[in-house]
A protein has these predicted regions:
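Periplasmic/extracellular, small/polar-rich flexible segments of pilin-like filament-forming proteins
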Residues: 855, 859-940
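Conserved hydrophobic/amphipathic alpha-helical signal-anchor segments
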Residues: 810-856
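Extended, solvent-exposed polar beta/coil surface segments
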Residues: 1-218
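Extended, charge-rich low-complexity interaction segments
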Residues: 443-466, 511-539
């Protein structure tokens, strides 16, 4: 027994010694590997260095945050990428004599064999860090973030050699022509370009720093200009409507394209100007008759017909809508798309007009304001919109007094930036103008009768005065009257939106399209100037003075053609920031409506003519769009609001929607009864297809998703993985009457004949059920068995071609899937913002404590943490690593069961949300039901959305109840409402459509 214990003791000690030896040996090997893989050549003005660091096994989906720095700020323009190391050769026997035992030979052989086997299966990754540096003395490079390391760099001084005269560029520093240096500098440049492309391909990462630096360095050192377009991006034809739609919506891809365009060197602009082209020749739509006694709200008679019209009917409705946009994502746009930055458009509008809503206004606004509407000629809230607010006063003297007091207070508050209040004359009327030199505040105020108008645009003041003096108004137009026939004032919409044909025509007019592209280029120029200023400070160390455009151009930070523009505008420094000489400060540009020009370049004219020809021939007319929202209580015992939504495109020009007309069959008053336990289902009445060989009747396609736990999102790469995911989906897809798609497949791939119960199985494991005219598919036979009980055609209360129903996803088992998907997207977006801050620190030498403010200034937006936290600056450690920004909501990383944490970085495809995480929209979304109907004269979307009430203070709740009372319960037939007030194009009842079809030989 004593002998056995002694043996165990000796064995334990031996294992402990073995572990220590392995640990010591591994650390020594790592240190030797790092120090043994450093190359550095010193030269003027910059040397170049490259080092390799072992990183273990990394998944291709892993992202790393690594910041490269040194105590003396000698490192410039680092590039980080990843390489797979070559696996070691495995020999059956080693050459040379070797010891059979002793001196660690056995341990060494075991360790080597295990490592070789592992690396043959999964070769380790290497992190390659390349950078330029100043000086020739040894220095220490430090890596911070996902990897902490310190590496000694001892540069080798190369013989002096300058760039050949025919290669040297004017005003650009030369690089050494030593072969060793050129090999390494080419490797650095390739890595730098690849790093920029990776960042550009990340949709959640605004890679403007990398885009600017790659172009600047390429021009400086005569490298080839890289193609930095995103993967899959193609240049669209001028006759494609999407570029114009992108201009109207201000799509980010277009901004990125114009940013890159501003970086390229272009030939001198042609001085030949041509007249601005004519707009498209639009065809006026025929508007149905409206009765003379139709009720039109008086405020609509004060609105120019070319303006959009957003009416709230009361001040409390406006407050509700404002809270909805702020609490449900910060912006209406962010209610649909989770983003890493917020343009704060509500605050911009309040700042421009000086209309910040106070607590007093919230309590007493309805006692002073009887009606209000936001109007404007465009929706470009980010740049400087042409918008205004019309107030219908219950007490005009009190309302004007309140506004005047606010304007006087603003002059005192903003006196340091030159804010002034003055009376000017427009169209013979005295108008109050509150403004600052950079257009941060630009608020015109004018009143007529019981109406007060606040606007950013002088042109809108002129149009308001013209309309109020008797010129045609929006309320007078036949199309608006038709809208009010379909959506009567008596319906008391909490929010009513009307976008007229004239509004859309104005947006695609030559003035708007040409000026919009010009102002987006001006924004890109301001961004480039900001980055050039930071790069100048990083390289020269001069941070206290603001360099001129001439200085930046002469030193190669800006292209020679930077200030060359058709409209003659310039990028100028003013009050410590860059402005456009014609339009003002970014985010507060002069409204497009107030910019006058009659000439344009030949290129601009031709581009617009191409676009105009498309609209004149393909669209021919613009269709008005109207939306109404009403609030109801879903159930008095539940804290859930029901939003009843009606949306119309009417009068409808069917030609431009030919793709929709060809796909949809006529609306019918028949629907398919689907299983009640579906958490999501939809159905659409589709047109049949007839060919010489086959025939498919008009049919209903339907699909549903059960309340079951689906597979974890993101695991669908590869055909087999996708098939496994589809097999695990608790879903079904069907058609009635059977369209026959499957039976046309060759070689019997559509499955054999059904059994007595109607079931058959396809070759990929899909079950099929056929009976009573139905053909339904699912990977789960039990789902089909459940469908067989419920599926049948039944009469519907309304005519429709599309119907969708979504249950309360937050209480379903599907919520885990949505939470995981949203968490991964939010985490990657948050991490992208952190990497932007890293880029400012290591590429442009911005002090860590200033990186956030600089990023927000360059983007003209607030960086927001999509996880719901705040960005905070961590503390630098004792080893002098740089302080890095973090998110206060960043969770401990959890991965899918059966997976392992990445050794470095963050892998969003395998990460799982914390237990208490919930997708933001699941916190307030409680269900929806929508119907789509296309009629000869109208396109209709009607439905309900159930949401949690917006949190308000007790005082605000009391004020709302005293004014409007509690929300009523919805007691109207919403889905049949479009046919009650206007029946000109209502489908006729067709018993044939409602008759149950006979069993046919055609199948799904």
């Amino acid at each position: 027994m004593i002998f056995v214990r002694k043996q165990n003791f000796l064995l334990q000690r031996a294992l402990l010694v073995l572990a220590c030896l392995l640990l010591f040996n591994a650390s020594q090997l790592l240190a030797q590997a790092i120090q043994g893989n450093v190359e550095a050549f010193a030269a003027e003005p910059y040397g170049v260095a490259r080092l390799f660091i072992p990183a273990g096994q990394l998944a291709t989906t892993t992202t790393l945050r690594i910041v490269v720095s040194d105590p003396s700020d000698r490192v410039m323009f680092p590039a980080i990428d990843f390489l797979t190391s070559e696996p070691p050769e495995v020999h059956s026997a080693q050459t040379g004599a070797r010891q059979r035992f002793g001196n660690g030979a056995l341990i060494g052989r075991i360790r080597t064999a295990i490592q070789n086997a592992k690396e043959q299966i999964d070769p380790p990754e290497l992190i390659r860090v390349q950078f330029l540096f100043r000086g020739n003395e040894p220095f220490v490079v430090r890596l911070s973030g996902d990897m902490e390391a310190s590496i000694d760099v001892r540069p080798i001084k190369l013989p002096d050699s300058t760039t050949a005269p025919d290669k040297q560029k004017q005003n650009s520093p030369s690089l050494s022509q030593s072969p060793q240096f050129q090999t390494l500098i080419r490797s650095w440049w390739d890595g730098y370009v690849q790093q920029a492309k990776r960042q550009l391909d990340r949709s959640d990462y605004p890679a403007i720093v990398e885009s600017y630096l790659t172009h600047m360095l390429a021009y400086r050192y005569d490298f080839e200009i890289p193609d930095l377009l995103k993967k899959g991006a193609t240049k669209r034809k001028q006759t494609d409507p999407l570029p114009t739609i992108a201009l109207v919506a201000g799509v980010e891809e277009l901004r990125a394209e114009l940013f890159l365009e501003s970086l390229r060197k272009s030939p001198p602009l042609s001085l030949r100007l041509v007249p601005t082209p004519e707009p498209p020749r639009w065809v006026d739509a025929t508007v149905p008759y409206t009765p003379e006694n139709l009720v039109i709200e008086p405020i609509a008679k004060m609105v120019p017909p070319e303006c959009y019209y957003l009416r709230f009917a009361s001040f409390s409705n406006y407050l509700w809508f404002q809270s909805l946009s702020q609490t449900r994502g910060g912006d209406l746009a962010q209610m649909a798309v989770l983003r890493g930055f917020n343009y704060e458009t509500n605050k911009r509008m309040e700042r421009l007009l000086n209309t910040k809503t106070t607590a007093i206004a919230k309590l007493f606004g309805d006692s002073i304001i009887g009606d209000m509407a936001i109007i404007g000629q465009d929706l470009y809230l980010q740049e400087g919109p042409s918008l205004g607010v019309v107030f219908e006063a219950k007490n005009i003297a009190l309302l004007k007094s309140s506004f005047n007091a606010d304007r006087v207070a603003a002059v005192k508050k903003l006196s340091d930036v030159g804010c002034k209040l003055e009376a000017i004359e427009i169209a013979g009327e005295n108008v109050s103008l509150l403004s600052t030199p950079d257009n941060q505040v630009r608020s015109f105020m004018v009143d007529r009768g019981a109406y007060v108008f606040l606007t950013t645009s002088k042109k809108l003041v002129e149009r308001f005065l013209e309309v109020s003096s008797g010129q045609p108004s929006l309320g007078d137009s036949n199309a608006f009257r038709f809208a009010r026939l379909m959506m009567p004032v008596e319906n008391k919409y909490d929010v009513f939106v009307y976008l007229s044909s004239e509004f859309f025509r104005n947006l695609v007019s030559p003035k708007y399209q040409i000026e919009l592209r010009r102002r987006l280029k001006a924004i890109a120029a301001i961004e480039v100037a900001e980055l050039a200023t930071l790069t100048y400070a990083a390289e020269t160390g001069i941070k206290d003075t603001f360099p001129s455009i001439e200085r930046l151009t002469a030193d190669g930070y800006l292209s020679p053609s930077f200030q060359s523009r058709v409209d003659g505008s310039q990028t100028l420094a003013f009050s410590g920031s860059w402005h456009d000489s014609l339009r003002g400060r970014r985010g507060s540009f002069l409204p497009i409506a107030d910019i006058q020009f009659s000439d344009c370049s030949a290129e601009e004219a031709q581009s617009y003519r191409d676009q105009s020809a498309f609209y004149a021939t393909q669209w021919q007319q613009t269709d008005p769009l109207m939306v109404g929202i009403r609030r109801f209580s879903r159930d008095p015992n539940e804290k859930v609001e029901r939003l009843a939504i009606e949306a119309y495109v009417a009068p409808l020009g069917r030609e431009k929607y030919g793709w929709l007309s060809s796909m949809l069959a006529p609306p019918v008053r028949t629907q398919i009864q689907l299983p009640p336990d579906d958490v999501i289902n939809c159905q659409a009445h589709l047109a049949g297809q007839s060919t010489s060989r086959s025939f498919s009747p008009d049919h209903v396609m339907f699909a549903g998703l059960k309340d079951m736990v689906p597979p974890v999102p993101g695991e669908t790469k590869g055909l087999l993985a996708t098939l496994r995911t589809l097999q695990s989906l608790p879903a079904y897809l069907g058609g009635w009457p059977r369209p026959g798609y499957l039976d046309r497949l060759p070689l019997g791939l559509g499955g054999g004949p059904p059994d007595a119960m109607g079931f058959s199985k396809l070759f990929i494991g899909v079950w099929r059920w056929q009976m009573n005219g139905f053909s339904v598919l699912s990977f789960d036979r039990s789902i089909l068995e459940n469908c067989a009980i419920h599926l049948r055609p039944i009469p519907a209360e309304d005519f429709a071609q599309g119907r969708i129903r979504i249950g309360d996803l937050g209480k379903s088992r599907l919520s885990a899937w949505f939470n995981t998907f949203w968490f991964r997207r939010a985490a990657q977006t948050t991490r992208g913002n952190l990497m932007l801050l890293d880029s400012l620190q290591q590429q442009l030498k911005v002090p860590p404590e200033e990186a956030l403010s600089f990023a927000e200034r360059i983007l003209d937006a607030k960086l927001q943490c999509s996880l719901g936290g705040k960005y905070i600056l961590g503390k630098a450690d004792s080893n002098s690593q740089k302080a890095m920004w973090e998110s206060s909501a960043w969770p401990k990383q959890i991965v899918i069961s059966g997976s392992k944490l990445p050794s470095l970085g963050f892998d969003d495809t395998k990460s799982m949300p914390p237990e208490n995480y919930q997708a933001p929209w699941l916190q307030w979304f409680r269900g929806a039901q929508l119907h789509l109907t296309q009629l000869p004269e109208r396109l209709i979307v009607v439905g309900t959305i159930d949401i949690e009430p917006i949190p308000v203070s007790p005082n605000e709740m009391a004020a709302e109840k005293s004014t409007n009372g509690p929300l009523p319960k919805m007691d109207l037939d919403l889905f049949n409402l479009p046919f009650q007030f206007f029946q000109g194009d209502k489908p006729k009842g067709d018993k044939g459509n409602e008759k149950k079809p006979a069993e046919t030989r055609k199948s799904f």
